[in-house]
Amino acid sequence: MNVREHASLRLLLCGSVILLPVLAAAARDKPETSSSIIQPAAATRDGQHDFDFEVGSWKTKIERLAHPLTRSTTWIKYEGTTDVRKVWNGRAILLELEADGPTGHFEGLSLRLYNPESHQWSLNFSNSSTGTLGVPTIGEFRNGRGEFFDQETLDGRAIFVRFVISDITADSVRFEQAFSDDGGKTWEVNWIATDTRIRHEYGPSH
């Protein structure tokens, strides 16, 4: 499965090999060489409960760029619901999504796994049509913002993938995916999702 197929899994989920802090810096500041970008470093903060806020049921609105890194300006919209629950006493989070869009109905899932040694999360995605997990993005939360990265190929080109979780409140959250084909100098956002909590289902402490 190539990165476009992997990306399709993410693009249908609201949410992926170790966190690459230098890559994160490149996303904010300037490009780095390939050798510097692949240097790993582990987080030190205990982030086991970072995804507790996400537990519950949500209304989900998704916008997906039709053809990433092609200067495409065509966006496709989806709407659905997302259910999130804890497993492994909070060291893993299981997300299940159902949504509808121009291509019809789909079902997907994300398994978020916490590594107690590196203090980082891996975000693993799949959908019911493939039955396989895509390449995970791995990272952590800092100051209320989650950043997760991986390195893949798209149409024969090496790219970086960045997945950001931000604007977190008790009742809403934003997810954003972007690709870079220039070593992290610039990023093109190709997927945006906003979740709004469904209060009558169950609350964040469930």
Question: What are the language-model segments listed below?
Answer:
Residues 5, 23-25:
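Coiled-coil-like amphipathic alpha-helices with heptad-repeat character
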